[in-house]
C-alpha cells in the first residue's frame, strides 16, 4: 500500500537553488556579526576602526576583481580610480562646499570618462604589456597630482575640513557610522559580482579571460566586453574611494595613485580567490587580521615593515600553493556556497 501523501518526502532543492541558499547563509552570518559589533560592550573604537579598514579594502578588492578576476585584465594601475574618487570628493567639498553624497557621483562620472579613454588606449594590449601600461598611467597621475598644488595640495596631500558629527558632510567622530556604510557597500558589491558572474555579460568576460581568440570566434565582441568591464570596475573603485576619503579624512599622491596602494587593493581578491564573489571578502578579512597581528608584533619586537614581509610571504604561499586563493582551499561543499 502506498504511503499517505502527507508523509511523502519533500522534493530536494535543485543544485542551483541550494547553492544560492548556501551563499545567502554564508552572507547573513558575517553581516550580522559585523552589524552587532558596535553594540557589544567589549568592542572599542579601535576594533571597529580595524573592521572599517577591512571593509574599505574589501570593496576595493571587489571592484578590482571585476576587471582582473572575472575579466582577466591585470590592471596594476587601478589606484588611479581610487585617487579620482578621493580627490574629487575632497576638492569639491573643501573648495565649493559640495557634500560627499554629490561629490561621489562626480568622481564616478570622471572615472567613467577616464576609464573609457584609458581603456581605449591600453586594452588592445595583452598580458604584461597591458599591466605595464596601467602602471605608467598610475605613475603619471602621481606626478600630475603633485604639480597642481593649489588644487590637490601637492606632495603634502589634501585634508578634509572637519565639521564633527555630520550626515551632510559624511563625517563622524566615531568609526561606527563608517562600519555600516562599508558593510552596505560590501553587500552591494557582492550582489553586483554575483549578478555579473551569472549574467551573459559575465560569461562573455570569462570567455575573453580564458581565450580571446576562441571568444571572438564564438561571436563575443572582445574589445567591447573588456572596456565595459574596465569601466564598471573603475566606477566601483571611485565610489569606494569616497568612503576611503571620508574615513581617513586625507589623501596624498602616493596613497591615491602610488603603485604600493594599487598592489594593496589587489591583495583581497588575490588572497581570497580571483573571479569569485566571496574571494575579496575572505581575503580582505584575512589581510586586516594579519595586519593587526603584525602591527602588534612590530611594536613588541621592534621590527619595522613586518606587515609588508608577512603580506609578501602570504602572497607567495597563495601563488605557489593555493592559486585559487583561500576559497580554493575550502572543502568542495563549502566552495559551492562561497563562489
Where are these regions (language model features)?
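Transmembrane alpha-helices and adjacent helix-loop boundaries
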Residues: 1-339
